[in-house]
Regions:
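Cell-wall glycan-active module
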Residues: 1-335
Length: 335
């Protein structure tokens, strides 16, 4: 079907890197049919810009018959994104100006983050971006500032964070505060996390740690939080247990054997193959057969296969079955 082939050609062609030569015959037929439009060429130019493929970007620019001046400006910004400091050249109302500025600032941020933030603020004041684009770009810049924990950009980060409503960025800011031992900033940003994140073991633990640095009332609250956290079976629960001298809560639950379901196992040819493969020490083949076997059954039946494996001393297969059956509380089987 020619239409299917041409649809596939479009999907293949719209890519930010050079495609293999084997694709050329398909692309040529697609182009002859008049389906490679100027809009598509421009879209691929933007993709190649994002991928850092200047050669492809330059080649595509020569295929344009319209918007040649815009293409020249895009190429110029790619080569030197600091050109964006000449704000008047990118202040027109055309949508492409906002696109060039957006992509140029992202590229500049990889070379000179401080300059990128400075220029972003100037363009933002002149309403260069739509609300959505401005939000996405500010998120990108804030993330880079948080990754590098650039002290000179902390005020920018602290101004933008409340506007972005992003748990992952707030968590990065909290880690920054922990690294520099800034309890005040930690207490400022913890409430900006969603309630679910605030109540997670990680941030419950660190809230208690920060409270330990406070007055006696806060220290007492920290002990209460740690005691409660120590009831959980996770890294922070175990760490809290160490801090309050309480035993770890393993919460073991033995998987119950279902005699009726166990009888069904004896008729399973797949299980017979696993048994024979293990007998001749074909461990990899037995494991592959075991995984296929488990995939044929629901969770209740997978539990019984897990029990069968452990009973027969097939410990690695038992662990695999416990994972698929989600037997997270059967500690003896999992470990």
């Amino acid at each position: 079907d020619q239409q299917v082939a041409f649809d596939g050609a479009k999907s293949l062609w719209l890519y930010g890197r050079t495609r293999p030569e084997e694709c050329d015959p398909l692309f040529q037929e697609w182009q002859k049919a008049g389906l490679r439009t100027q809009e598509l060429i421009w879209s691929r130019m933007l993709l190649s810009f994002e991928q850092g493929q200047y050669g492809l970007l330059s080649y595509l620019s020569r295929q344009l018959t319209t918007n040649k001046n815009d293409a020249k400006r895009l190429l110029a910004v790619y080569k030197d994104p600091r050109r964006l400091r000449h704000k008047s050249k990118y202040s027109g109302s055309a949508k492409i100006n906002a696109t060039i500025v957006d992509m140029g600032l992202r590229r500049l941020a990889k070379k000179d983050l401080k300059q990128a933030v400075k220029l972003y603020a100037k363009y933002q004041k002149s309403d260069r971006f739509s609300d959505y684009k401005g939000r996405q770009l500010s998120r990108y810049l804030v993330r880079r500032a948080l990754i590098y924990q650039t002290e000179e950009l902390r005020s920018f980060v602290d101004t933008m964070l409340p506007l972005l409503d992003s748990d992952d960025l707030v968590e990065m800011r909290l880690r920054w505060a922990l690294r520099v031992k800034d309890d005040q900033q930690f207490q400022r940003y913890l409430p900006q996390l969603s309630q679910a994140k605030q109540n997670s073991p990680r941030w419950t633990y660190w809230r208690a740690r920060i409270l330990q640095n406070g007055d006696k009332q806060q220290q007492q609250l920290a002990l209460q939080i740690l005691a409660s956290l120590s009831e959980q079976r996770n890294f922070y629960g175990f760490t809290a247990a160490n801090m309050v001298n309480k035993p770890y809560r393993i919460q073991h639950q033995t998987t119950v054997i279902d005699p009726q379901r166990q009888l069904q196992l004896t008729d399973d040819r797949g299980l017979a193959r696993v048994t024979e493969l293990l007998a001749i020490d074909k461990q990899s083949d037995a494991r592959a057969e075991w995984v296929m076997l488990l995939n044929r059954y629901d969770k209740p039946m997978q539990k019984q296969y897990a029990v069968y494996a452990v009973t027969n001393g097939w410990h690695s297969l038992g662990v695999q079955a416990s994972i698929q059956a989600k037997l997270w509380n059967d500690m003896q089987m999992r470990f």
